[in-house]
Regions:
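N-terminal ordered "arm"
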Residues: 7-66, 79
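N-terminal "leader" segments that precede or initiate the main folded domain
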Residues: 1-6
Length: 423
């Protein structure tokens, strides 16, 4: 309920009748202040007139005034800057660390706000606001989706920064970790990322002109080369891997759980690893080349890939199948662009301070079709249809970061829902 009070305060949704402190002083809220998501008072730099005198400082909000002492604010100097304590239940006085009293105001709001809040939080419908969406202005929805897309970019940038730290600042290595994870296409993503963490790109680069040796490193580190090879090709790879493992002091992954049950053969980890090996055989500095590409076609051509001849007739070692090229489909390539290339382009642009790179990241998403998954289909049923991949990324962000966590108070659609007075 405290979040609701903060929401009411932030948007000044309380009655406009004269406000007073518990001591009878008049209160005029000039500026409610900036919300604070970290430790300290709830709102910074508020501007409030108390009995005609302008005060600039912080505001703290509680359901009960006694929460001030319960949270030990009376012993925390970070709260000495509070100029007004706002509660829906003033059940005690509040004091700063030096013993001086803090002006308090009881905050009331229309009953429909609480009713709307309960509707959103307690309803079994998903999303709870689905009835309102078709009635909202398109400009409002477009603006919200644009903000969500940027928010998703920033969130992915944080993950990339974590990968960079793990890779000791090596952008190519960090890119490989992310690309490998996304080559798992959900089902094997964790296994692919764990596998990629064991692959030193310096070793791969030294043998980049030899696809067979790259495959030996990749399959060996994946733990997919058996002690008793199932055919001549896997036997040759096993022998080559033993040599390269000794040369580069490689240790194969021991606890990877590759999933293949109820999976299309084209998605088997063997095929995906063979495709990755081919990509790194053909490209010197994969990230560098992708960053230079300015169109979706160029990116698709770089990522199209393929495999060595062996995999034209195999999905796993030792089991022949009718000959079929194992190239990535446009849909799969587009997912790699959306989830790997574009976030790295944005993150690299932020890192270098090159705005044209961050803008290109957004432009590339607008050139791609929206993703087709259950989240996007859900929003379409509610009246929110993605026009391009930028929109679909925004809608994924909306569901995962707002709807699933019931953060309706922080959502622009939720804000419109709270304000509505009709049922």
């Amino acid at each position: 309920m405290e979040h609701l009070l903060q929401f009411v305060w932030k948007h000044k949704l309380f009655p406009l009748t004269p406000l007073h402190t518990t001591q009878g002083q008049t209160v005029e809220v000039i500026d409610p202040g900036l919300p604070n998501s970290d430790a300290g008072p709830d709102f910074f730099n508020a501007k409030i007139k108390i009995d005609g005198i302008l005060w600039v400082g912080n505001v703290e909000i509680h359901v009960h005034a006694s929460d001030w002492k319960r949270h030990h604010h009376h012993q925390d100097r970070a709260y000495d800057s509070v100029i007004l304590h706002v509660s829906s239940d003033i059940d005690t006085e509040t004091f700063r660390t030096d013993g001086t009293p803090i002006p308090q105001m009881e905050l009331h709001y229309p009953p429909y706000l609480l009713d709307n809040y309960r509707e959103l939080i307690e309803t079994s419908h998903y999303p709870a606001c689905y009835r309102l969406i078709p009635r909202l202005p398109k400009l409002l929805l477009h603006s919200w989706l644009s903000s969500l897309q940027t928010e998703r970019f920033e969130q992915k940038t944080q993950r990339i920064q974590a990968q960079l730290t793990q890779s000791k600042g090596d952008w190519e290595q960090a890119f490989f970790l992310t690309l490998a994870r996304n080559f798992g296409f959900g089902t094997n993503s964790d296994a692919f990322e764990q596998w990629a963490q064991t692959i030193p790109l310096q070793a791969v680069n030294k043998h980049r002109d030899n696809l067979f040796q790259i495959e030996a490193i990749f399959f060996g580190q994946a733990g997919l080369l058996q002690e008793l090879p199932s055919d001549d090709y896997s036997a040759q790879l096993t022998k080559e891997y033993a040599y390269l493992a000794h040369k580069f002091e490689l240790q194969p992954s021991e606890h990877l759980r590759w999933k293949m049950l109820r999976m299309r053969p084209g998605n088997f980890p063997h095929v995906r690893i063979a495709q990755l090996a081919n990509l790194y055989h053909r490209s010197q500095g994969m990230l560098s080349q992708l960053l230079l590409a300015s169109t979706v076609k160029e990116l698709r051509d770089l990522l199209r890939g393929g495999t060595s001849l062996y995999w034209l007739t195999h999905y796993v070692f030792g089991e022949s199948s009718p000959a079929r090229p194992k190239t990535l489909s446009d849909a799969s390539i587009d997912l790699l662009i959306i989830n790997t290339v574009v976030p790295f382009l944005y993150a690299y642009g932020k890192h270098k301070g090159e705005e044209q790179l961050t803008e290109r990241a957004g432009n590339l998403l607008e050139q791609l079709k929206p993703e087709n998954n259950y989240i996007i289909r859900l929003w379409k049923e509610c009246g929110l249809q993605a026009a391009h991949a930028g929109d679909s990324q925004a809608l994924i962000q909306l569901k995962k970061n707002y709807c699933d966590t019931k953060k309706c108070l922080f959502c622009r659609i939720g804000y419109e829902y709270f304000k509505k007075k009709e049922g």
